[in-house]
């Protein structure tokens, strides 16, 4: 099974599909943050849930890093073009400004921004799972202390 990182690295047109996939997975994962039902079962399921969702976050991080690398490469090619082909001498600062305005660079940075937002949503999910683990631990401690009626 090839992951989304490989798909995106092979074909940048797969980015919308990757975003849709991870948004859909995020919606499913949000249900896993809720603590309800049997505490023992919830505790037993937590390691697998955390491993799966953390691995997905790592794939998003890898795609984001790949996009940043490609954007730097694109910026570099425009930078070189301006330095070599412009009639008058330009300062590096001038060239930076021109490169910042290139449509391809702007489009890339928008995609990077969208992926960064997706990554941040997943970081929020992982924080929620951390809180769930903490709550499970507290409920178990209450039960050990004799407060059997701790309900969720």
Q: What is the predicted role of each segment?
A:
Residues 67-110:
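Extended, amphipathic alpha-helical coiled-coil scaffold segments used for oligomerization/tethering
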Residues 68-76, 107-142:
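Long amphipathic alpha-helical coiled-coil segments
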Residues 61, 81, 123:
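Catalytic phosphate/metal-binding cores of nucleic-acid and nucleotide-processing enzymes, i.e., regions
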Residues 143-152:
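Acidic, low-complexity, intrinsically disordered peripheral segments
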Residues 1-30:
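Extended, charged low-complexity scaffolding/tethering segments
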Residues 1, 31, 38, 150-151:
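Terminal, low-complexity, charged helical segments
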Residues 24-55:
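Short, charge-rich amphipathic alpha-helices with coiled-coil/heptad character
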